[in-house]
């Protein structure tokens, strides 16, 4: 079994959540010490409500480094621009554009098609 790409491991931690949209809390998640290792609030982050399989499938047969669009829509939560680390939260369902490297998602590019 090939070793998982380090960037994919980071991508999963940063962008994929098994929590439902209803249960998800931007302030709780974004202020978690794992998310703010240097104590700085991250200005914006989008979370994909999914298990890892369908997200990884976007990068199937993607050799090299390339941006790919999902063929299915995902429920998404975006945590926005904190004022004193208090986040606003917006939910949507949409396609996603991610950067794939050798069959692994490594970067969230944007909501919507590439």
Swiss-Prot record:
One of its GO terms (molecular function) is endonuclease activity. Pfam families: RnaseA. Its EC number is 3.1.27.-. Glycans are attached at residues 27, 67, 91. The active site is at 15 (proton acceptor), 107 (proton donor). GO terms for biological process: defense response to Gram-positive bacterium. InterPro entries: RNaseA, RNaseA-like_dom_sf, RNaseA_AS, RNaseA_domain. There are at least five different forms arising from glycan heterogeneity. Gene3D superfamilies: Ribonuclease A-like domain. It is an enzyme of class 3 (hydrolase). Disulfide bonds join 26-79, 41-85, 59-100, 97-114. Substrate binds at residues 42-46. One of its GO terms (cellular component) is extracellular region. It is found in: Secreted. It comes from the Eukaryota. The keyword Nuclease applies. The keyword Glycoprotein applies. Keywords: Disulfide bond, Endonuclease, Glycoprotein, Hydrolase, Nuclease, Secreted. Belongs to the pancreatic ribonuclease family. Monomer. Endonuclease, hydrolyzes highly polymerized RNA, poly(U) and poly(C), and the dinucleotides CpA and UpA. Hydrolyzes rCA, rUA and rUG. Has cytotoxic activity against cultured human submaxillary gland carcinoma cells. This is Amphinase-4. It comes from Lithobates pipiens (Northern leopard frog).
